[in-house]
């Protein structure tokens, strides 16, 4: 069976068994010869000819590096030189800028004609002047902020209020400083003065804090009073039972001052400090719940004999 794909009349291959004896071989040409340069130019045609410039010896085309330098120089020449203004021109420009920072086109034309300057130069000057003013304002504001911040750091901060529940008001030292500097006398006392109420948590203050507070306040009375008599008089618990309440550090404020009133032989006991206002009828729980309350003179004074009560009635 004959193959359909095979040609019916096969032709011999032209490159097989070909005789090259009649062919002429072109000898290599010298690149310096003008014929080689002309041939290379003819081979580069159309748009490719611009990119096929061969820098061969004897070629008339300039080198590529020189052309690039020339193009860069031409671009640099396009930038205008810096305009220098005379003193009169500068004053005229500044005067108009002080009036308006955005002059319209008519003002720019008039000013350009008056100063013999191009209108574009006047326009550029105003634009640069606005930028300069904005930059100066930013620098001034930055300096002001830098001056304010160090001054705030140097200001002493006010002491914060102590969050401790043991802090109370008014302070005892402030109370005693408000007393008159003259010698103590019943006629000079303000019997209507009151104490600010304090919560029961004040009695739970630690011993060391009470001792520091008491040490900062001078003793009001010089005569010492027996603490055991106070305990018996006010039905207080034993000293061992109240060690946590720290009443033992307030002995100096539980001292009496004795005065003879109206020629009568009875002496009255006046108590100051935290024990003010306590009567024998009050028990320990009542005292803790009603600490630092204000009482009248008859409630705060206690005589040796309860039957002999003296009402002085001072205002």
UniProtKB/Swiss-Prot annotation:
One of its GO terms (biological process) is regulation of transcription by RNA polymerase II. Residues 154-163 have a biased composition (Polar residues). One of its GO terms (molecular function) is DNA-binding transcription factor activity, RNA polymerase II-specific. Expressed at low level in testis and undifferentiated embryonic stem cells. InterPro entries: HD, Homeobox_CS, Homeodomain-like_sf. Transcription factor that acts as activator. This is Arginine-fifty homeobox. It comes from Homo sapiens (Human). The lineage of its organism: Eukaryota, Metazoa, Chordata, Craniata, Vertebrata.
């Amino acid at each position: 069976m004959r193959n359909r794909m095979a040609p019916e009349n096969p032709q011999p291959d032209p490159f097989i068994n070909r005789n090259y004896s009649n062919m002429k071989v072109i000898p290599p040409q010298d690149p310096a010869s003008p014929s080689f340069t002309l041939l290379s130019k003819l081979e580069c045609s159309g748009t490719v000819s611009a990119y096929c410039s061969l820098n061969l010896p004897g070629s008339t085309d300039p080198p590529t590096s020189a052309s690039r330098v020339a193009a860069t120089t031409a671009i640099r020449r396009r930038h205008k030189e810096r305009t220098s203004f005379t003193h009169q021109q500068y004053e005229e420009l500044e005067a108009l800028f002080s009036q308006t920072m955005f002059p319209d086109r008519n003002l720019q034309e008039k000013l350009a004609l008056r100063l013999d300057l191009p209108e574009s130069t006047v326009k550029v000057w105003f634009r640069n002047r606005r930028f300069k003013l904005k930059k100066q304002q930013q620098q001034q504001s930055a300096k002001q902020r830098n001056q304010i911040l160090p001054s705030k750091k140097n200001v002493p901060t006010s002491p914060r209020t102590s969050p401790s529940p043991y802090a109370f008001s008014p302070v005892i030292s402030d109370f005693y400083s408000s007393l008159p500097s003259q010698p103590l006398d019943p006629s000079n006392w303000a019997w209507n003065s009151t104490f600010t109420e304090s919560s029961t948590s004040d009695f739970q203050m630690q011993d060391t804090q009470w001792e520091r507070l008491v040490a900062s306040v001078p003793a009001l009375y010089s005569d010492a009073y027996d603490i055991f008599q106070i305990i018996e008089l006010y039905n207080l618990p034993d000293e061992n039972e109240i060690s946590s309440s720290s009443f033992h550090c307030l002995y100096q404020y539980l001292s009496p001052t004795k005065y003879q009133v109206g020629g009568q032989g009875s002496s009255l006991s006046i108590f100051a400090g935290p024990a003010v206002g306590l009567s024998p009828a009050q028990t320990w729980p009542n005292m803790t719940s009603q600490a630092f309350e204000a009482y009248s003179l008859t409630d705060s004074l206690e005589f040796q004999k309860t039957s002999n009560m003296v009402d002085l009635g001072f205002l």
